[in-house]
Swiss-Prot record:
Gene3D superfamilies on file: Alanine racemase (3.20.20.10), Lyase, Ornithine Decarboxylase, Chain A, domain 1 (2.40.37.10)
Entry GO MF terms: diaminopimelate decarboxylase activity; pyridoxal phosphate binding
Stated name of the protein: Diaminopimelate decarboxylase
Residues the record lists as binding substrate: 281, 317, 321, 347, 375
Species for this entry: Zymomonas mobilis subsp. mobilis (strain ATCC 31821 / ZM4 / CP4)
Modified residues (N6-(pyridoxal phosphate)lysine): 63
Family: Belongs to the Orn/Lys/Arg decarboxylase class-II family. LysA subfamily.
Pathway linked to the protein: Amino-acid biosynthesis; L-lysine biosynthesis via DAP pathway; L-lysine from DL-2,6-diaminopimelate: step 1/1
Length: 421
């Protein structure tokens, strides 16, 4: 489905015109299409049906968007959760995702986080170093529990994506080098409190070519074969996530979920293990927009600035990654002009688009920053003492506030008065 479309000259989310959302909930706010995200979950699950041994686990990467409403929607679709902190575990469980469908990744798990994960019975730890093996063994022993473990292997595959979101090359902090895999598994097998359950890999995010995924999977299977010859049974293979989405209207469509699924089935044919996947962006990015109002138009000798009430603290991707987002007038006109689209934060880097051709908006017009469902609200901050914005979910002609707008009082609530100041 198409979650955002023009109807009678106005951009709508499903069946609701975005001006109605702005009038009811204010701006800026994030707006999500429930129908789209559930459709994506179903397509992903269906595309991977029959891959590997038994039913694959699709574990949503919670870091992409940890909203309780979104996690609850995915829980109802049978998805699990890929998490990287105890906080994300708590969010997933609170939203209804069973602990056994949770995979705990990340290079910096603390003993306290491991303890909590063991106590609630998560499905798998993806361990990324020998020292982490040692820590988990100690924690599991202290609790009298046995931890199910996969080692994350770094396959040294170039995913051809932005350097800051490439995770499968040898020079990144992630995973254990492929040449060290066998010795790491021998170390893992030496601890009675740890169970060898599987192997894991994740090469990056926003990948728009299937070849790196295929190369990584083939490398992982080579290691699985070597491990099995050494007497280590591998029950699960976590192939990570990273499938990209289209951010620019004039870009070619990236590989579909179905094409990805066909490639996975072909490459993993004959694998005697259950497969796990960690999609994030590909499920949620195009389900959301950041809805904003034009504060004013500023003209200078060198540029025209469209100043929005949204800022880099609300959506940091353009500042952090030079990421491109389509930015559309909610009620577009035939007239266009070139402009820099910026926010009110006191940073030159507070810019969403530079020298962009857009509908000739004016003060109080609404604009939608598209494809903002992933790594948007989750990466927001209160910089310049700007409260976090509201989040809204839409299904058909129904809408609901899923996170209220913060107030400045909310920002100051946890601060403490110091008597001697």
């Amino acid at each position: 489905m198409i979650p955002f479309s023009l109807k009678n000259g106005t951009l709508c989310v499903e069946d609701i015109p975005l001006p109605e959302i702005a009038a009811q909930y204010g701006t800026p706010c994030y707006v999500y299409s429930h129908s789209y995200l559930t459709e994506r979950a179903r397509r992903f699950t269906k595309a991977l049906d029959g891959a590997g041994k038994g039913k694959s686990l699709v574990a949503f990467a919670v870091k992409a968007n940890p909203s309780q409403a979104i996690l609850a929607s995915f829980a109802k679709e049978g998805l699990g959760a890929d998490v990287v902190s105890a906080g994300e575990i708590r969010r997933a469980v609170h939203a209804g995702i069973p602990p056994e469908r949770i995979v705990f990744s990340g290079v910096g798990k603390t003993a306290e986080e491991m303890r909590y994960a063991l106590e609630i019975g998560i499905g798998q730890f993806n361990i990324e170093s020998v020292s982490e093996i040692e820590m988990l063994a100690e924690v599991a022993t202290s609790l009298g529990k046995k931890a199910a473990v996969a080692l994350r292997i770094n396959p040294d595959v170039d995913p051809h994506t932005h350097a800051k979101i490439a995770t499968g090359k040898a020079d990144t902090k992630f995973g254990i080098a492929a040449e060290d895999a066998l010795s790491a598994y021998e170390k893992l097998a030496s601890y009675p409190s740890l169970k060898i359950q599987g192997i894991a890999s994740h090469i990056g995010s926003q990948i728009t070519d299937l070849a790196p995924f295929e190369a990584a999977a083939e490398r992982i299977y080579e290691i699985i074969t070597a491990l099995e010859k050494a007497g280590h049974a591998i029950e699960t293979a976590d192939l990570g996530g990273g499938l990209g989405v289209r951010y620019k209207d004039d870009q070619p469509e990236p590989p579909s979920v179905e094409a990805y699924g066909e490639m996975i089935k072909r490459v993993t044919k004959g694998w005697n293990c259950r497969l796990i996947f960690e999609p994030g962006r590909s499920l949620i990015a195009n389900a959301g927009v950041l809805l904003s109002k034009v504060i004013r138009i500023k003209e200078s000798k060198t540029a025209r600035f469209v100043i929005l009430d949204a800022a880099m603290n609300d959506l940091v991707r353009p500042t952090l990654y030079d990421a491109y987002h389509e930015i559309k007038a909610v009620t577009p006109s035939a007239q266009t002009y070139q402009a820099d689209i910026v926010g009110p934060v006191c940073e030159t880097g507070d810019i969403f688009a530079r020298n962009r051709s857009i509908s000739a908006v004016k003060a109080d017009d609404l604009m939608a920053i598209m494809s903002a469902g992933a790594y948007g609200a989750t990466m927001a901050s209160a910089y310049n003492s700007r409260p976090l914005v509201a989040e809204v979910m839409v299904s058909g002609n129904k809408s609901a506030l899923i996170r209220k707008r913060q107030s400045v009082e909310d920002l100051m609530r946890d601060e403490q008065k110091v008597e001697w100041l």
